[in-house]
Amino acid sequence: MNKKILETLEFDKVKALFEPHLLTEQGLEQLRQLAPTAKADKIKQAFAEMKEMQALFVEQPHFTILSTKEIAGVCKRLEMGADLNIEEFLLLKRVLLASRELQNFYTNLENVSLEELALWFEKLHDFPQLQGNLQAFNDAGFIENFASEELARIRRKIHDSESQVRDVLQDLLKQKAQLLTEGIVASRNGRQVLPVKNTYRNKIAGVVHDISASGNTVYIEPREVVKLSEEIASLRADERYEMLRILQEISERVRPHAAEIANDAWIIGHLDLIRAKVRFIQERQAVVPQLSENQEIQLLHVCHPLVKNAVANDVYFGQDLTAIVITGPNTGGKTIMLKTLGLTQVMAQSGLPILADKGSRVGIFEEIFADIGDEQSIEQSLSTFSSHMTNIVDILGKVNQHSLLLLDELGAGTDPQEGAALAMAILEDLRLRQIKTMATTHYPELKAYGIETAFVQNASMEFDTATLRPTYRFMQGVPGRSNAFEIAKRLGLSEVIVGDASQQIDQDNDVNRIIEQLEEQTLESRKRLDNIREVEQENLKMNRALKKLYNELNREKETELNKAREQAAEIVDMALSESDQILKNLHSKSQLKPHEIIEAKAKLKKLAPEKVDLSKNKVLQKAKKKRAPKVGDDIVVLSYGQRGTLTSQLKDGRWEAQVGLIKMTLEEKEFDLVQAQQEKPVKKKQVNVVKRTSGRGPQARLDLRGKRYEEAMNELDTFIDQALLNNMAQVDIIHGIGTGVIREGVTKYLQRNKHVKSFGYAPQNAGGSGATIVTFKG
């Protein structure tokens, strides 16, 4: 898009509004490079990124990014083979740290579905080894001792030598106190010296490094520390050499990853920019607009971002509408309306949020052109009219159906009659070429053009005749009218003069009366619309609050359920462990006394959960009422425990059901829906175990035929427990064939029971698939 429109609309000032929300220099650079695009996929991506970041902020309102400096130049130097200094390494260290924090944040992020942002988070690289290498550089700007063993050794020796120097000097301070001007150790030329009185300079052997301005003090490095100081100087040289070697070595390690680190820095900046956009949305109540596919524009309560206390207006530029002509006097806000439309489009096509209400839509234009303000050139000696016309001629040669055109005071600066005619001719040319145009003018002739011409619409800026001030409200569909008579009358002009003037333009008065009626209708519609918007805003706030509360309740519910599951698992584990111990004790005894059996049964009973009476539970009763049977439902006949399907309902309310090969007529109380079986309260029945003797030891048989499914499963559970208590090796379970429901339940139960060694169907002469023989572990 041409740079001139960005300058005219002051787009750089708009971008500056986002700067306070940025945390990184990379994000700042990307913001400054931001420009509008006509590529729909890029705009959609930017909109999707903002929406996902908004969702992220709902779950993580304090999401932040570590501040980083620009490292493009640093990475370029690395790629060129240069070695980095400590300050440059610290910049890289900061970027790697920011990258790692973002990766950790993304890994731990929950309850947010990301697509576009996920791509950026997942593209960040992980450099654990490099991060370890860069720990050698302290944030204060020095290399740590642990950077290398040699550096640590050199610094230990320096420390020891410096300690010796201090000890020697402290001794001399005490011994030669009368020879010194003051009792301190001074420093000159990087050497530790004593401030000796000039009269005693020959009393202390050493090297003179300085003399005070008065000549009374001579700074002498005692001979006892000269050798130590020279050793320290040599060690300092070794230290500098080792630090250079470390810088070179780490530069070589980082060099192969320079491009990846630079890319990570760009991603960090991009995420920072998206974050800044959302912070702007929160601060200014901005929105992410919808994207129109046909250049349709619908802006709801749109504001100019650079105007303080700007009045919000609605603008609708339909698909078929080619021109909106804003008529009326100056100083009413017409130019601001032009800029608001243009700037909103530029912001949206740059991937920025707009200052409007939810539901706003923007189009996509390849170019936006504008002729706004007095751009005459003094050097070219052009008049206002010539300047505007030169610009318009240039624009008319460039615009096409994919352009948006903004024209301020079209035809101004020349004879009104000729200017109006020229303005209409230009608008007609643009209309025929189907170029969307918004134009302002104070020529009344263009009102008629807007009314009579298809696909052209009048508009105006509201003027309050009571206060004699513009309200800056945009009234689309209502042409502007001159308020000269009302203003003159309120300012004190004679009513006679005003009356004479009004009689001379009776025809215009008729038009003004029509316009006045339109204004009143528009104002009434606007009031109703404002009320609707207030209700919508309240609903949105309530919806957000309810959604937040719902999410919090869900999280709390899940937390409580997890706790309950853990507690239940612990109880079950404890119960199983205790029951195993009881059974183990029973198995270890060859003969059991009656009272021991009773005690063991009592212990096992204590392990069973307490019964809960659900018959009075209103929630379950209500749920049961809701589950009305219908044709096609699977049922279980209570008297037989057989499974069937409802085929029809008789007039008397009874049901016909197909149970296997048998057709039955049942009342609703005689069957249960299959899906409700799990909800019925468990009823435990006493099961009698019939012992019989054989060569293999005691055996027992349980007959489940004719039982309901739940009843059969409860009896089976009790039967197996008693069989284990009686130390039986094998039992028979008769379940019949039927629909196979009970047989399947028996099989699943035996598969779960860890005391069962094996099980299988009985021989054909003993019941076949209608009975199961169970063998227990010894």
UniProtKB/Swiss-Prot annotation:
Protein encoded by which gene: mutS2
Function noted in UniProt: Endonuclease that is involved in the suppression of homologous recombination and thus may have a key role in the control of bacterial genetic diversity.
Annotated residues for binding of ATP: 328-335
Domain of life: Bacteria
Organism ancestry: Bacteria, Bacillati, Bacillota, Bacilli, Lactobacillales
Disulfide bridge partners, by residue number: none
Keyword DNA-binding: yes
Domain Smr: 702-777
Family label: Belongs to the DNA mismatch repair MutS family. MutS2 subfamily.
Protein name: Endonuclease MutS2
Single GO MF descriptor: endonuclease activity
Leader sequence segment: none
Name of one Pfam family that matches: MSSS
SUPFAM superfamilies assigned: DNA repair protein MutS, domain III, P-loop containing nucleoside triphosphate hydrolases, SMR domain-like
The keyword Acetylation is assigned to this record: no
Gene3D superfamilies: 3.30.1370.110, P-loop containing nucleotide triphosphate hydrolases
Assembly information from the UniProt record: Homodimer. Binds to stalled ribosomes, contacting rRNA.
Any one GO BP annotation for this protein: mismatch repair
EC number(s) per entry: 3.1.-.-, 3.6.4.-
Alphabetized UniProt keyword annotations: ATP-binding, DNA-binding, Endonuclease, Hydrolase, Nuclease, Nucleotide-binding, RNA-binding, rRNA-binding
